[in-house]
Amino acid sequence: MIVKICGLKKAVDVAAAVENGADMIGFVFAKSKRQVTVDEAHELAKNIPAGVKKVGVFVNPTEEELTAAIKGVPLDIVQLHGQEPAEQANRTDAEVIKAFPVKDGKLPDNINDYPNAYILLDAPAEEYEGGSGKTFDWDKIDRDLLTKNKLIIAGGLNAQNVQEAIKRFEPYAVDISSGVETNGEKDPQKIKCFIKTAKGVE
């Protein structure tokens, strides 16, 4: 199972994620309590080995903002959490994760407009997009409508429920942020526990 640890701001947290087998490291460039600058992410990325993908999280970015981060960090993947048009996703010089909020168990009508992107399902936004720590209603999702090799599950995951999410959705990857935090800060022990559980290692 591919595991993405998102919202990292400190070198010690990046190290904890990498050392315990994270496959993707997420840096949040959108307005958030986890927001970092391109320069900050660039410094953190120096400690990420080549086999671990660096992901930048954005909400309705300009082309210039995307390009600056892709080149400046550099990023392997951009994660789009706003109302970005499919045209923007399709011409981005990186792999793309397109995030969709799941409201009332319904998938958005435009979910198929991004054929080349990974599709991330998340709980509806609160003050900021993503990182709310809440799950969406897993029971109402028609899994037959989802392409599993492109599917990423997020929203309210933790070490206690991630295996159930994997069994239900058989996703390509799982994505976590607040579920590996204690008092609003990344917790290295929770990072370790989540990764080991998601990958099925005791």
From Swiss-Prot:
Domain of life: Bacteria
Entry-linked SUPFAM superfamilies: Ribulose-phoshate binding barrel (SSF51366)
Keywords: Amino-acid biosynthesis, Aromatic amino acid biosynthesis, Isomerase, Tryptophan biosynthesis
Catalytic EC class: isomerase
Keyword presence, GTP-binding: no
UniProt keyword Cytoplasm present: no
Reaction equations catalysed: N-(5-phospho-beta-D-ribosyl)anthranilate = 1-(2-carboxyphenylamino)-1-deoxy-D-ribulose 5-phosphate
TM helices/strands, residue ranges: none
Family annotation (Pfam families): PRAI
This enzyme's EC code(s): 5.3.1.24
Annotated Gene3D superfamilies: Aldolase class I
One GO molecular-function entry: phosphoribosylanthranilate isomerase activity
Record pathway: Amino-acid biosynthesis; L-tryptophan biosynthesis; L-tryptophan from chorismate: step 3/5
CDD domains: PRAI
HAMAP family to which the protein is assigned, alphabetical: PRAI
PANTHER family on file: N-(5'-PHOSPHORIBOSYL)ANTHRANILATE ISOMERASE
UniProt record similarity statement: Belongs to the TrpF family.
Name of the protein in question: N-(5'-phosphoribosyl)anthranilate isomerase
